[in-house]
Amino acid sequence: MKKIALIIVLVLAFTSCKEEPINPDRFKYGTFEIPEGKGYEKTIIVRQDSIQIETYEDRIDTLSISWKNNFNYTLKMINPKTAIDEDPIHIKITNIDKDSYDFEAVIGHSNYVQKGKLIKKSN
């Protein structure tokens, strides 16, 4: 009888300690921040449906967002002002934490990879 009770306790202990998987879908909507970094100011991002609005350095840009899967998406300026604004920005999520993710961004077909962190502030 003691063995059965011990087995039940152990099973309950192991199943209750199971960590919930991190769901990347929560990064598809809400308000986010990219902290200030070397060469760029803090950026505030609001995502709704297929639109992303970015506010930085007293500028506001509106981009369409197209998700390839939970870890890759493409941004495209809706009203490009320069030739470089016409190129799509390909984003790859490289690591997910509780309320943030690390990413790599490539503009167009460039070989330059910009790395950064996006932090979720609210839904």
What are these regions (language model features)?
Residues 40-68:
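N-terminal glycine/threonine-rich, aromatic-flanked beta-hairpin/loop signature
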Residues 24-39:
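Tryptophan-anchored aromatic micro-motifs
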Residues 108-123:
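Edge beta-strand at a domain terminus
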Residues 43-45, 62-66, 88-94, 116-120:
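Hydrophobic/aromatic beta-strand elements that line small-molecule binding cavities or substrate pockets
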Residues 75-98:
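An anionic, turn-rich surface loop/hairpin at beta-sheet edges
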Residues 1-4:
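Positively charged n-region of N-terminal signal peptides that target proteins for export
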